[in-house]
């Protein structure tokens, strides 16, 4: 099949030589060329030894030029031996139809000189944009090569011109620098009016390198190049192309960039690059390993820091198992033993300030005989107005020096000074007679007659002078003093100030059980008056403290009585202070030794516990007296402790 086509082509070529005239040859070639291209595209051009088109380009989209080669035939190297014919078509459809009909007229190249050797130049008058062109090469009527295109497809601008560079910056080490390369667009491209739009590509490298570094495409006519070695020479070149096309122009002239000379040592230091990346990697790995080791070794402590344990309830001296098992009795026992856990009952229980009883005179002896009421309340308290229980800011007890009552109308007897002096003088006068009485005479004589006849001043002193409250600067609780006239003075030695606890109040106080009655020793009449001993004159029975002067007098009396009774007083070392009752008992032991206990006397009834002195001892709250109408100011006196009193008694 292919051989038949070749023979047909040769036959047509031979027959074409029989026609004469110059116009017949192009027409025949025009008819034969499309047929050859349709039959075999490889036959569109002659063999490699024949002339052919190399390129067609339009630098500014206004003109274009086409170039070809001479071939191997020496006859074709002579000028004018090869001709270029072109043909314009109105449109692609019309061009295809005309080419198919073989009726289009071909025109020869208008200029073989302007574009150079073996070229054809088409100026603006022969150039039409967006209109297809077809060109062909012939020699002596023979078709050498053929090509069709449009002008906008063959645009290939000229290279940029006027390359230059400017130093922008130098690094702190002085080893690298930044430059800016600038250029001008091709002079024949109408870039300013926008007829053609160009984009550029810049390439640079060191002189001794073979590979170029590419930057682009760039629309501007300048471009910065960063981090160039200042100790090396660099080459820069630029080329351009129409936007959205693939064909670049030729490269511009190479621009050499030479920096000023720099220190060679600095360049060497720059060449030695420190492996910062590896150091960072190994550093992070080492820190992670250290953290893992620390967390693994201290995991218990870290766990306690993050999640601290819940503290177990714990009381010092108490087993927590007792609280868990609910053994509250044992816990209360432990709390009672330790002083730190003792409750302050005085904060919860209010003290009794005074007790008022409405008792008929006829029933006084019957109801109050042998009871605590005889000691707490008496007719002398109601009649007397010289007893004052004033609270001192420092000690909590009564004081004659309270500034709030300095302007009070004093009693006419001047209880703080006159009464005390009068009593002291009476005691000095009666002391010798009272202590020198014969024990036998005291036993034989009636009590009222002996004391009333021998010492009438004693009864008068007791009736007129009420017991004064004693001062204390070291006690915490405020105690009001009370006078306790009793039918028999010997019963004072047998009164108990401690009793058994029978119940506990909700506020924390203890209720004592009533005590059993005891023998008093001497029958008491309903109309008998109480006769005070020398040691009872200057202090009250209910007072928890005593004055130093009164103590010395009582001790002197007790020593005189030791000669007859041979009874030596003793004081408990556990007590912090000596109570008035103990002194009274010691002073009266000689008088009560020979008296037979015939009468019965009851111990104190009910009261509240002030504090726990020992596991088996309770200190009771004293009963306060009602405040009188007028204030009396007792004189101040010192206090004697247990050790001091024992030394004096020895």
Curated annotation (Swiss-Prot):
Covalent S-S links between cysteines: 56-66, 109-120, 134-148
Organism: Mus musculus (Mouse)
Signal peptide segment: 1-24
Official protein name in the record: Growth hormone receptor
Domain notes per entry: The WSXWS motif appears to be necessary for proper protein folding and thereby efficient intracellular transport and cell-surface receptor binding.
Span of the annotated motif Box 1 motif: 306-314
Location(s) in or outside the cell: Cell membrane
Region of interest: Disordered: 466-486
């Amino acid at each position: 099949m292919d051989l038949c086509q070749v023979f047909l082509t040769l036959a047509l070529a031979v027959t074409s030589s029989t026609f004469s005239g110059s116009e017949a040859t192009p027409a025949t070639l025009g008819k034969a060329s499309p047929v050859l291209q349709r039959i075999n595209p490889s036959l569109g051009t002659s063999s490699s030894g024949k002339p052919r088109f190399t390129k067609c380009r339009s630098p500014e989209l206004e003109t274009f030029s086409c170039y070809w080669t001479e071939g191997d035939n020496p006859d074709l190297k002579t000028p004018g031996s090869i001709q270029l014919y072109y043909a314009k078509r109105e449109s692609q459809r019309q061009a295809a139809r005309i080419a198919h009909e073989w009726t289009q007229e071909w025109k020869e190249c208008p200029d073989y000189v302007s574009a150079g050797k073996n070229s054809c130049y088409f100026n603006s008058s022969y150039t039409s944009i967006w209109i297809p062109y077809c060109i062909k090469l012939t020699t002596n009527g023979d078709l050498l090569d053929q090509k069709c295109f449009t002008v906008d497809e063959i645009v290939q601008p000229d290279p940029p011109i006027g390359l230059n560079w400017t130093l922008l910056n130098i690094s702190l080490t002085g080893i690298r620098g930044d430059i800016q390369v600038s250029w001008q667009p091709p002079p024949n491209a109408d870039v300013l009016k926008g007829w053609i739009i160009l984009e550029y590509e810049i390439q640079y490298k060191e002189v001794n390198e073979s590979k170029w570094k590419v930057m682009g495409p760039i629309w501007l006519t300048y471009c910065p190049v960063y981090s160039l070695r200042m100790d090396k020479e660099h080459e820069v070149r630029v080329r351009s192309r129409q936007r959205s096309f693939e064909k670049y122009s030729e490269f511009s002239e190479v621009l050499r960039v030479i920096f000023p000379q720099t220190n060679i040592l600095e360049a060497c230091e720059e060449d030695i690059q420190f492996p910062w990346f590896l150091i960072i990697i190994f550093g992070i790995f080492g820190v992670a390993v250290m953290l893992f080791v620390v967390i693994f070794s201290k995991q218990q402590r870290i766990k306690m820091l993050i999640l601290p344990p819940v503290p177990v309830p714990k009381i010092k001296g108490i087993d927590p198992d007792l609280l868990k098992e609910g053994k509250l009795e044992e816990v209360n026992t432990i709390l009672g033993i330790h002083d730190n856990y003792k409750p302050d009952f005085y904060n919860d229980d209010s003290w009794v300030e005074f007790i008022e009883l409405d008792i008929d005179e006829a029933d006084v002896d019957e109801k109050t005989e042998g009871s605590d009421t005889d000691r707490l309340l008496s007719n002398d308290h109601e009649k007397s107005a010289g007893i004052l229980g004033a609270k001192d800011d420092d000690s909590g007890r009564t004081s004659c020096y309270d500034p709030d009552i300095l302007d009070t109308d004093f009693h006419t007897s001047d209880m703080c000074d006159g009464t005390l002096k009068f009593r002291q003088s009476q005691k000095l006068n009666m002391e010798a007679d009272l202590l020198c009485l014969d024990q036998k005479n005291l036993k034989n004589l009636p009590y009222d007659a002996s004391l009333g006849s021998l010492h009438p001043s004693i009864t008068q002193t007791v009736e007129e002078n009420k017991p004064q409250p004693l001062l204390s600067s070291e006690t915490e609780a405020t105690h009001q003093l009370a006078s306790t006239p009793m039918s028999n003075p010997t019963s004072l030695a047998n009164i108990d100030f401690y009793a058994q606890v029978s119940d506990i109040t909700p506020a924390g106080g203890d209720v004592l059980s009533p005590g059993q009655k005891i023998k008093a020793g001497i029958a008491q009449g309903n109309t008998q008056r109480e006769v005070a001993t020398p040691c009872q004159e200057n202090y009250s029975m209910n007072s928890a403290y005593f004055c130093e002067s009164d103590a010395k007098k009582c001790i002197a009396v007790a020593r005189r009585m030791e000669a007859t009774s041979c009874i030596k007083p003793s004081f408990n070392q556990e007590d912090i202070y000596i109570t008035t009752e103990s002194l009274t008992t010691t002073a009266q032991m000689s008088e009560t030794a020979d008296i037979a206990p015939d009468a019965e006397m009851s111990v104190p009834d009910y009261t509240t516990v002030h504090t726990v002195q020992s596991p088996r001892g309770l200190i009771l709250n004293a009963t306060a007296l009602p405040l009188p109408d007028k204030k009396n100011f007792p004189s101040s006196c010192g206090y004697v402790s247990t050790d001091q009193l024992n030394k004096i008694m020895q």
